[in-house]
Structures are given as C-alpha cells and as structure tokens.
C-alpha cells in the first residue's frame, strides 16, 4: 500500500483542514507518474533525463535493505568527501559533523554504493551557488522578476545548474517562490515578487534552466514562508480560495516544469505544520499537481516521526523527525536524546518492524493514531521512491542495475563541466540580467542618461559607499561568494565616462564606522575592573541560552576574566568552539542617533543587548541565528529585533571574511546604558569580532561634506541601499521602521537634493522602501541587488549604453500605513508567550518573537491572518490606495505607443489578445506591455475577485520608430476562479474587461471579452 492510498484508507484528513476534492481540471500539462523526464535538446547535445521507468525505480527500492532506506531519508550537513570529484575520489562519504576540507554545502543524503546509487550533495540558492566556494553571484531573484523575461529566467537557471554541477553538487535549494506578502520580510529579495501569475511564468523557465543542466531544482518553501520573524512559531490562517489562487500556482508551475524536489516550510498552515500537512503534501502536491518527486524538510522544520506518514520524504538536519531529536510529545515516536548517531533512524527502524502506538492529544499537539509496521514500510518505500524519481530525472541513476551504464556497483555520473571555463559566459548572463532588471522609477527633465556635458566643469558627484563597495546581494541562504574581483559602479562609471571626465566621490554615509575608543566604555560596577575604562571579557558556555537569558559560565578550561580596551579580535586569540561575552557601560555625551557596528567572522551566533533584555525588551539585537558558512565567507544572519534598526550589513571592504551588522539607537544626553555583546565561535575556526560605531557628530560631518560637494556639481548621483537577510525582517518588529532606508540615508538624500536640484538616486533594494524625498529628486533608478556584475550594469544604464526596461514586480507604497499588513492597532511592545493576536497584530505576527518556553509549551503561538486574495496591487485597488509606484511600473529612455487592440474570444475557452506597440522615441528600448483581466459583471456569491489581475505580458525590444504586433494567449485557467463549493477551477462566464497597460495603473488600451464554457 502506497502512502497516498494508505492515507485515504485511514481517513487521516483532519476536520479542521480545508476540504479540497480535486477533479484534475487544471489546464497545465501533467508530467504523470513516470520516473523519466524530458531530455534536453540543445546544441551541445547534453542529456539530463534518466532512462529508468517508475516500475524499475520501484524494483530498485525493493532491492534495498531497511538500513539503506532509512539512511537515505536522513539528511545531514555534509559528507567528509564532499569536495571529491566522483570520477577520481571518494563517492560515498560517511556522514560527519566536520566541515574541514568541504565545499561548505548545505545538505547531504547518503546513497547506496552497492547498487550504484550516488549520494546527494546539496547547495543553497537562489541567487547562485551558495557554498564555501566561489561561483557567479547572480542578481537577486526579485531583479530577475523585474525583467518580465522568460528567456532571462531560463539563462538564470542555466548558470546555477551548470555551476552547481561543476562544484560537484546534485541538488539546488532554489527557486524560492513565496509571495511578497509582508513588505518588510527579510527574504523578499530571494523571491519573484507579489504576483502569482508573474511568479509562475518566471519559475517555470528557471526550473527548466536548472534541471536541463543535470541539477535537481528544489521549489521552496511549501507553503507560505512569507516572512522571517517568528517563522517557526507562526500559524497561517488562510482560506481555500486564497491558498489555491495565490499561494499554490507558482508551485504548480514549477512542478509542471519538472522540478525534482519540494522543500516544506517551517510554518503551520491552518494549524498543521507544513512538513506533516496531508492537505498540502498529499492532496495538493501529489494528487492535484501529480508530483512524484522528493519532499524534503527545511532545516529544523520537522517535528514528529509521523511526518513521514503524512507526506514528508526526507528530514534534513536539525529536525525532530525520524529519530533525530527529542520533541514535546509523550508518545514513543522519537529516539531518546543521545541514543545512536545522527541519522541512524533507530526509532523509525523499530516502527517499520513493530509498528507504533497511538498517541493522545498533548496540550495543542493533535492525537496520532497507531500505525502498523506495514504502513510504516509503505511510507518509507514511497519516500525512497520519490527521492530516486528526482535523481532519475537528472540522470543520477545510470550506474544502477537498471541504468544505461551499469558498472556493477560503481555509480555513473554524467560529465561535469569545468568551473573556470564557465566564467565568461556566466558573467555575461549575470550582467545582461542586471541590465534588463534596471527599473527607472522616475526621470524628470530627462535627468538620465548622463550626458557628455554633465561631466564638464564641476562634473558629476557620486555619493554613497555602495558606489565604491559593490552591493552584490542579500544575506542568508542566498549569499554567494563571487568569482574574482567585483568591479564597483563608481569605477565602471569613471571608465565609461571616458578620459578627462569629471567624476568625484564623497562617501556621505559611513558604512563601516570606527573602533569604539576605550575611554567611551566603562567596566561593569560589579566586576573586578570597576572604575576602569574598557570591556569586561568573560568566557561563557557554548550553549546558547533561550530567549536572551544570561549565559551559563564556562565549565572547563576557562580563560580568566580580562579587561579589553576594545572589542577588536582579528587573529586567533579566541579559539574555535568557544564563546565569549563583553560587558560595559556607555554614557551618551549628547543626544542623537548612534550607529552600532558589529563585524564578525567564523561565528555560529552572536547577540548584542542594549540595557538588557530583562530591563527593556525593545533593546535586543540578535546577530547570528544564521551561522557563517565555510571559511567565514557565509553570511551571518545579522538581525535586529524589537525596535533596534538594522542599518547595514555588508562585507567590510578591508576583509571579505567579515560580515557586518549595523544598528541605529537613539540616546538622550547624559544617559548611561549597558552594552552586552556575546559571540560564539564556529567549531572549525577561531572567532573574529570587532565592535565599531558612528557617532551623531560623525553623521552630521558626513552629510555636510556631501552637501558641500553637491553645491557645485552638475549632477549628484546618490547610491543608497537596504538589506534583506534570512532569519529577520527589516526593521525588526516595526514595519514602519523597516520600510525606511536604514541609518541616515534619507537625511543624506534630502540634504543633497536641497542644494542640487539635479539629484539622481540609485537604489540597491530587494523590496519596497518608502521614499519621503521622491518629490525632491529628478530621477530614481532601482537596480535591486545586482550581483557581481552590477557595477558595470549600473554604469551602462546611467550612461545610456543600455536603456532601462525593468518593471516593478512589487508595489512601492508612499507611506508605511499603505501596505496590506499594516494595522493601526498593532502594538509590538506587547510581548507574550501566549497569543494568538496579543498586541492586535494578526496581519504581521512577526511583531512578536515568541519562543518555546519549555518542552510542554503549546505549539500554537501566533496566527497570521491573510487579507484573502487582496495582496500587493490587488490590495491597493481593493481599498482605493494610490501607491507611490505601482506594480508593473518602469520607465525607459524612449517612449512607446499602444494601438490596434484585437480580442479573439472564440479559441476553445481561451482568449488571444493582440495589439501594436510602437517605439515613438529617439532611442532603442524594451517595453513590457501587461494584460490585466477585470472582475466579472456578476460574480458568484461568496467568491472574491480582484478589480484586475495580471494574466499576460510580453517583453519586446524595439528600435526607434519600429513597431510590432504583440500576441498573447490567455489560457482558460487564467479566466477561472477557485470554487470553494466545487473545490475546483471554474470559468467565470460572461463579459470581462481586459486592460492593456505599461503598469497596473497606467492603462493604455481597454476591451471586452465574452467568456463562456
């Protein structure tokens, strides 16, 4: 009995879940249950598809021992031979906690050597191959979405696919396809915007690009990992229509495109964890979408052994499932702590042999029925079959007895490309996409492009440190170590402007700060160094305390307390696998805002407390929930919680090994504050850490220098940024703060624009930011996080070598209150361990940081109540709020005219829309006409419809005076709505308006279509 059938028989669908009886009416092509996959057909003749059938895959499962099956579904951090080339070195490494000598990959699953099944080596994405190894740092995926270009998406995936294989990886944790729902979500830059249709179109081609190179693409995070704060403690309360129409379509598109794997999310959906959610994993993913591939958990996203029964295939590291760790559950479904090595699966093995008992309701943990050994065996066999199916799709099973290259136990792997040989082509793709993504938001008086005359006289002034310190990408799982030197926008602009051109640079904003002087810090009054200047340094336990509690003291081989004049460790003084605490007091000499800067490398975690969590919960900073990766190059999750503002996190220009976290805090004159910094060294390398700041006086002087230079400049180009990262949302718990540019960048822009009326702002942002200065500057160019070729790409756009053609995949509000998750009643200061909805923040539960207080704490913590189908531009239309810049907006250096609309609604339930677009300007450029469908004149009762929704688009490049007829097919699926009554897609019949425009608000043509069955 297969798992899907066993669930139907057992009737395990909880009554609290939405009933979704799928009739299979989806119009998208279904890959079917076949182990093979479409083969690649290109000029190189490379074939990625495997030859095994589903029957042969089942037979291969039958040949495996119980121990081999259990081993295969247990994920681990990395294997000891992860850097070995399968053609010449070890292929089947044992699982090891050591990262020494490895590529810094994210995950690892064992193979079966005797059957020729290789292990699976797994890398993070989704903006390039994220390892402790160099790769091409691509533009952020939100920038890819801004291209509205399917072919660019295919190229984007191709780069990751071939580079991943070149670095001996088999699985890529990408694309990320969670909607931009919360405007300040830390990982918005990793995803593809706020619109489900656009996301589905882009992800389909990205997946094809990845998998045709022989790398398994992993769609993540299934489902609704739409923000970072409290992502592990959030329940998503979502209705059936919204789930089907907004959250699931991109995953369906990715499945239809052949994605080999799905990563289930941390959150719960309608009270059930995503990684044990029968509705999502079995009813939707398996039966509705026809997915036969591999479902793996996010790291730490599993909770019970029964996750395997309910649809999970593989538990990745840090999870409670499959006997990996204890859980708050009295049932005997777990492996006792300390018994067996990670991944031995002792409890699962016992369940397969003897079955498992029923477990009653435990607090808010639901009851679990008893399962027989046969049911566990069927679930385990299904899980292994799904993993093998994914491997077969990219040709990883050709060395098995059923493969085309059976070698009697040795694996056969397709040739891997040489990484160095890929650089020229991949760099070009990276730069092309960065240029295509360039989104011109404003351009009064044709301020851009910069012209030859602008560089005469005082010339062009460039302001902002990210013009000289290239802003490559965001943090967390998406951080990529770029190949080679990364050219900056400033040096590319100087080179492009030509010899003798006037281009000056003034920082204006301090990205790095200065070392805190010893005289500014006093030792704690209760220490042996009371009355002296400096920091009390104490060695502490390496066990991270929960919820900001005081750390335990060091218990063995401890260093004596020391008085450090400053926190400045860049050598080997702080050994690997140790933990340290620095405490001191600071009295503000004057009122103002202070930028606190933390640099760290080789840290597994770091925390900074201002005035102590117990004294003031709003003064806590958490720096290192996301550990630094191999060699210290990985990104720390430098997060700010509870009101301290994250102002910067980038590479320290003096050392690529350091990561920087910066925070803004306001002090009154004469106030004394306590500072408490804790840092935990990575197990593999000595800790390096430095504490710096930017004082209020220094900020004033920085702005004044920029203003003085701007007075005489022909034009001022200001580079500003925000940063997203995994594990925290921008602004901590305060969305209004998170929507602003960090630090004093807003003040810098306002001051420069006040003295130079030809000010241009270049944004490196991964999501919406409010722009109080938008009316004071002439031009605004959004370059997103442009990757390692972002410098030349930015210069080309500024100089007019490339005309911007990007369109916003997100809406930009004019005020923090004009976002769908804003609530005037939300009170983030109300911190409680027993919500839901304490503080009246149901639209943004990330306002809290609840934790599991003890093992018997309820798993229900906070609820996220969605706005139904009204997100992004749909919400703005629904409530009648005008955004600052609408979804789909983007200007060009030329102009386009739309005309001659024709609508053919007689094509078998679909619609073909055609119209003419003409370039009426004097420059060549790209335009993205967009097609929006209006709501039906007589909508079904109980069903919501957007005022208009995106149903089609095309990107066209036109020379001056050139015209083209654009034809866009609108499928029947896009004319349908999800019927809660029928639990299926139903065409909304009758007359529907069609809007063709340059954005969701800039409508150029209108028409009507008669839609029938």
Whereabouts are the PLM-identified features?
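Short beta-strand elements
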Residues: 1002-1013
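Fungal secretory targeting signals
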Residues: 1-28
């Amino acid at each position: 009995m297969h798992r899907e059938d066993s669930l139907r028989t057992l009737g395990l669908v909880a009554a609290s879940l939405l009933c979704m009886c799928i009739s299979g009416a989806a119009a998208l092509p279904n890959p079917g249950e076949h182990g093979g996959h479409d083969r690649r057909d290109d000029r190189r003749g490379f074939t990625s598809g495997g030859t095994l059938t589903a029957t042969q895959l089942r037979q291969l499962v039958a040949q495996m021992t119980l121990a081999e099956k259990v081993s295969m579904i247990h994920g681990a951090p990395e294997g000891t031979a992860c850097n070995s080339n399968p053609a010449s070195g070890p292929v089947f490494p044992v699982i090891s906690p050591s990262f020494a000598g490895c590529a810094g990959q994210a995950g690892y699953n064992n193979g079966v050597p005797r059957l020729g099944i290789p292990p699976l080596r797994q890398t993070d994405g989704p903006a390039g191959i994220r390892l402790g190894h160099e790769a091409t740092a691509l533009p952020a995926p939100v920038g890819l979405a801004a291209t509205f270009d399917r072919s660019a998406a295919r190229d984007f995936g191709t780069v990751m696919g071939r580079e991943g294989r070149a670095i001996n990886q088999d699985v890529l944790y990408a694309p990320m396809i969670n909607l931009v729902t919360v405007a300040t979500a830390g990982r918005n830059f990793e995803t593809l915007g706020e619109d489900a249709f656009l996301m589905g179109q882009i992800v389909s081609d990205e997946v094809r690009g990845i998998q045709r190179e022989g790398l398994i693409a992993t769609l993540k995070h299934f489902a609704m990992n739409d923000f970072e704060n409290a992502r592990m403690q959030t329940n998503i309360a979502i209705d059936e229509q919204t789930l089907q129409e907004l959250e699931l379509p991109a995953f369906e598109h990715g499945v239809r495109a052949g994605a080999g794997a799905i990563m289930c999310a941390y959150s719960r959906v309608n009270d059930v964890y995503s990684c044990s959610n029968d509705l999502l994993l079995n009813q939707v993913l398996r039966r509705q979408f026809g997915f036969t591939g591999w479902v793996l958990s996010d790291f730490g996203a599993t909770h019970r052994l029964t996750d395997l029964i309910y649809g999970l295939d593989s538990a990745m590291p840090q999870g409670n499932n499959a006997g990996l760790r204890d859980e708050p559950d009295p049932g005997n479904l777990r492996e006792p702590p300390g018994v067996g090595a990670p991944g031995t699966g002792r409890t699962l093995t016992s369940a397969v042999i003897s079955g498992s008992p029923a477990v009653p309701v435990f607090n808010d943990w639901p009851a679990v029925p008893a399962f027989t050994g046969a049911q566990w065996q069927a679930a385990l066999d299904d899980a292994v079959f799904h993993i093998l199916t994914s491997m077969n799709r990219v040709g990883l099973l050709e060395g098995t007895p059923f493969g085309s290259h059976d070698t009697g136990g040795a694996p056969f792997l397709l040739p891997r490309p040489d990484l160095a040989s890929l650089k020229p082509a991949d760099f070009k793709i990276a730069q092309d996409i960065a240029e295509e993504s360039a989104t011109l938001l404003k351009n009064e008086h044709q301020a851009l492009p910069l012209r030859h005359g602008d560089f005469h006289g005082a010339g062009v002034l460039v302001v902002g440190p990210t013009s000289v310190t290239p802003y490559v990408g965001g943090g967390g799982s998406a951080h990529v170590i770029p190949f080679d030197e990364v050219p900056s926008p400033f040096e590319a602009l100087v080179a492009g402007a030509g010899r003798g051109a006037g281009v000056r640079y003034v920082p204006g904003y301090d990205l790095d700060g200065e070392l805190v002087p010893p005289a500014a810090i006093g030792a704690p009054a209760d220490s042996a160094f009371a009355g002296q200047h400096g920091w009390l340094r104490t060695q502490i336990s390496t066990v991270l305390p929960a919820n900001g509690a005081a750390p335990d003291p060091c218990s063995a081989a401890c260093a004596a307390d020391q008085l450090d004049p400053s926190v400045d460790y860049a050598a080997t003084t702080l050994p690997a696998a140790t933990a340290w605490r620095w405490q001191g007091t600071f009295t503000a000499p004057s009122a103002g805002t202070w930028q606190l800067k933390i640099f760290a490398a080789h840290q597994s975690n770091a925390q900074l407390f201002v005035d102590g969590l117990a004294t003031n919960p709003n003064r806590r900073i958490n720096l290192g929930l996301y550990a630094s990766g191999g060699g210290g190059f990985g990104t720390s999750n430098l997060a700010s919680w509870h009101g301290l503002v994250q102002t910067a996190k980038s590479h320290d220009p003096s050392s690529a090994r350091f990561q920087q976290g910066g925070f803004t805090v306001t002090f009154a004159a004469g106030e004394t504050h306590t500072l408490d910094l804790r840092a935990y060294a990575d197990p593999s390398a000595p800790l390096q850490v430095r504490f710096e700041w930017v004082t209020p006086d220094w900020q004033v002087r920085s702005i004044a220098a920029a203003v003085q230079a701007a007075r005489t400049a022909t034009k001022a180009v200001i580079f500003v940024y925000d940063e997203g990262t995994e594990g925290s949302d921008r602004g901590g718990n305060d969305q209004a703060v998170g929507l602003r540019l960090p630090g004093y960048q807003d003040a810098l822009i306002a001051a420069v624009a006040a003295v130079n009326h030809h000010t241009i702002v270049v944004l490196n942002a991964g999501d919406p930011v409010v722009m109080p200065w938008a009316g004071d500057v002439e031009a605004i160019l959004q370059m997103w996080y442009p990757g390692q070729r972002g410098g030349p790409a930015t210069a080309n756009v500024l100089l007019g070598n490339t005309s911007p053609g990007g369109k916003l995949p997100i809406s930009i509000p004019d005020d923090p209150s004009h976002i769908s998750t804003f609530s005037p009643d939300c009170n983030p200061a109300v911190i409680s361990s027993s919500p839901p909805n304490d503080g009246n923040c149901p639209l943004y539960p990330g306002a809290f940081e609840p934790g599991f207080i003890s093992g018997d704490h309820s798993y229900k913590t906070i609820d996220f109540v969605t706005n139904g189908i009204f997100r992004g531009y749909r919400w703005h239309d629904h409530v009648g709020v005008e955004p600052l810049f609408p979804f789909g907006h983007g200007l060009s250096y030329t102009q386009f005219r739309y005309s001659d609309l024709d609508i053919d609604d007689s094509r078998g339930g679909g619609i073909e829309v055609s119209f003419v677009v003409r370039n009426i300007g004097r420059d060549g450029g790209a335009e993205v006409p967009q097609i929006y469908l209006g709501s039906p004149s007589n909508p079904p009762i109980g069903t919501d419809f957007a005022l208009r929704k995106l149903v089609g688009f095309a990107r066209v490049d036109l020379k001056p005076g050139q015209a083209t007829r654009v034809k866009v097919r609108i499928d029947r699926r896009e004319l349908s709505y999800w019927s809660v009554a029928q639990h299926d897609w139903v065409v909304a019949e009758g007359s529907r308006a069609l809007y063709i425009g340059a954005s969701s608000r800039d409508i150029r043509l209108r028409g009507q279509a008669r839609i029938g069955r």
